[in-house]
Design a protein with these regions (language model features):
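Helix N-cap/beta->alpha junction signal
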Residues: 9-10
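Conserved SAM-binding loop
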Residues: 6
Length: 203
C-alpha cells in the first residue's frame, strides 16, 4: 500500500506537487510513496467527481491517504468560499469511505498565487532573473491583503510574455523544487504543509 494519492486539475499543479513532495526534509515529513492523478475535467472535475475517480481505481485499498487539490477560480462554484468548497468535497470523500484518511485543499484564487512567494528563485524562474521587469509587472496588478496580484495567473502570463519564456509545467516543478517553503505564506499552501506533516511525521 502506498502512502498517498493526490487528485489535481492540471499538469501545472501536478508538476508543482512533484517538485514539493520530493523535498520531504523541507516539508518536515518522512519520505513517502505517492501517485498523482490529473482529472481530465480540470477544476470542476476534481470538485464534483474527484471522489469518483478514486473509486474507479480502487484507491481506498491501495493508498493510506487521499488528497484533492483544485483552484477556486474556474471550479464553477466561485460563489462559495474555499472553506465551504473544502467541506463540500470532504463530505463526498467521507461518504466514499475516506473519513479520517483524506483532505481537500482549495487554492484561492488559483495555483499561480503560490508563485509569488518571497524568494529570488521566483524572479529567476518566471522572469529570467530580471528583477526590474518582475517588479514592474507585479506592481501593475491590484494586490491582495498579502501583497500578491489579485489575478496571479494573468500576472504570470504577462511576465512570461515580456521575457519570451514559454509557459510550461516544467517551470512550476523547477520553482517548487527550489523555492524556500517558509517564504510561501499563502493559506492554502500552509494548509497543505500542515496536512502532510500530520499524516507523515518525520521518522
Amino acid at each position: 500500500m502506498k502512502d498517498l494519492v493526490v487528485v489535481v486539475p492540471d499538469s501545472n499543479t501536478e508538476q508543482t506537487l512533484y517538485g514539493l513532495l520530493e523535498r520531504h526534509k523541507a516539508l518536515q515529513i518522512r519520505r513517502i510513496e505517492y501517485r498523482i492523478l490529473v482529472h481530465p475535467e480540470r477544476d470542476p472535475g476534481v470538485l464534483q467527481r474527484g471522489a469518483s475517480l478514486l473509486a474507479e481505481i480502487d484507491a481506498l485499498n491501495a493508498f493510506r491517504y487521499a488528497l484533492l487539490i483544485f483552484d477556486r477560480e474556474g471550479c464553477g462554484k466561485e460563489m462559495l468560499t474555499s472553506s465551504e468548497l473544502e467541506q463540500q468535497v470532504q463530505q463526498q470523500l467521507d461518504a466514499s469511505g475516506w473519513q479520517g484518511r483524506s483532505a481537500v485543499v482549495v487554492i484561492d484564487p488559483e495555483l499561480e498565487s503560490w508563485v509569488f512567494a518571497t524568494s529570488p528563485h521566483v524572479v529567476d524562474v518566471f522572469a529570467g532573473g530580471d528583477a526590474e521587469v518582475f517588479q514592474r509587472v507585479v506592481e501593475s496588478f491590484p494586490k491582495t491583503p498579502l501583497g500578491k496580484p489579485q489575478k496571479p495567473m494573468e500576472a504570470v502570463k504577462k511576465l512570461l510574455r515580456q521575457k519570451a519564456i514559454v509557459r510550461a509545467s516544467a517551470l512550476y516543478k523547477e520553482l517548487a523544487s527550489r523555492v524556500s517553503l517558509k517564504g510561501c505564506i499563502d493559506p492554502a499552501f500552509q494548509r497543505l504543509c500542515a496536512i502532510l506533516r500530520s499524516w507523515f511525521p518525520q521518522d
